[in-house]
Regions:
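Non-catalytic C-terminal accessory modules of carbohydrate-active enzymes
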Residues: 1-132
Length: 132
């Protein structure tokens, strides 16, 4: 994201299809993105910023922090939602609209133990026994 997107006339990679590339960038920079349209899940990534605040129409705010984020600390070691450890690899739309805090603890190595339970997997990665 730091290499392909810049604040210049040619700062977007590819074609800006009706704002989709910009929307992808904004969501991804916050650390999550709606990968599977039609679901209420946002898949986790790694935030670009150390802090971002979303102000919702309902008057609530969502503060997203990744204070130890850097070019080398680009992996999520731990995540807390409203102070509670959060192991899922997705966030739900209604949870975001409630406001509160999302704190990413970033590290220079992937945490291979985080988010490995079946309940931590998002819809788009779930196993469907009907599909063969």
């Amino acid at each position: 994201m730091r290499e392909l997107y810049k604040n210049t006339p040619a700062g977007l990679c590819g074609n800006e299809d009706c704002g989709q590339m910009s929307a992808w960038y904004v969501f991804s920079a916050m650390g999550f993105y709606p990968v599977c349209p039609g679901t209420d899940e946002y898949i986790l990534g790694a935030p670009l910023f150390k802090k971002a605040t979303l102000h919702f129409e309902n008057g609530k705010n969502l503060v997203i922090t990744a204070s130890d984020n850097s070019d080398t600390n680009r992996y999520v070691d731990e995540m807390r939602v409203n102070g509670t450890v959060y192991t899922k690899n997705y966030l739900k739309h209604n949870e975001l609209l409630q406001g509160g805090t999302i704190d990413f603890k970033m590290t220079d190595r992937p945490n291979m133990q985080r988010g490995t339970q079946e309940s931590d997997l998002p819809y788009s990665f779930s196993k469907d026994e009907k599909v063969k």
